[in-house]
């Protein structure tokens, strides 16, 4: 691994800059390079230094102008420069954010990275409207599932397990 961590996979949370972690806010402001998704709110992008290099890699349903392998290559290329690089992702990088794929690609290329968690969309939305994801006596757990998988694979969900009345079910895009 290279000496110091200069690549950070940062969760931007649900869009409100006040809901960023202190570390996420600091890294976004200090970053020399910001590689960001379409789901990152414009209010959060305003925190990025005007001197930073910004690279948009946003994806939409069935439209990926920058495929994941190219995003991985970008991260590795910027890691090689030694510049402080933030990979800014909506929500949390490890909740359907492909952060684990990006971290693995960096590590396989010999670069360490640090994960900075963010508030997930499910957490932010439930808190905003006052409906808890768990509640003693009602919901003893939370289950996150995706409604989509890789295009070459069928969606294979445990429908019976998902019907557990004691578990809150959160379905992501």
In which residue ranges do the predicted regions lie?
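Proteins with a high burden of low-complexity, intrinsically disordered sequence enriched in S/T/G/P/A and R
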Residues: 20-25, 30, 136, 160, ...
């Amino acid at each position: 691994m290279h000496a110091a961590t200069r690549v950070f996979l940062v969760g931007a949370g649900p869009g409100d800059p006040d809901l960023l972690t202190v570390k996420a806010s600091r890294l976004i402001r200090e970053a020399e390079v910001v590689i960001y998704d379409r789901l990152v709110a414009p209010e959060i992008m305003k925190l990025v230094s005007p001197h930073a290099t910004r690279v948009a890699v946003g994806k939409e349903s069935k439209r990926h102008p920058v495929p994941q392998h190219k995003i991985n290559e970008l991260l590795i290329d910027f890691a090689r420069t030694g510049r402080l690089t933030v990979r800014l992702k909506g929500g949390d990088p490890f909740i359907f954010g492909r952060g684990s794929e990006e971290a693995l690609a960096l590590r396989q290329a010999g670069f360490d990275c640090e994960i900075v968690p963010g508030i997930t969309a499910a957490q932010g939305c439930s808190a905003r409207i006052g409906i808890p994801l768990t509640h003693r006596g009602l919901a003893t757990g939370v289950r996150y599932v995706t409604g989509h998988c890789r295009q070459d694979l069928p969606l294979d969900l445990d429908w019976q397990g998902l019907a557990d009345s004691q578990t809150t079910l959160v379905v992501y895009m």
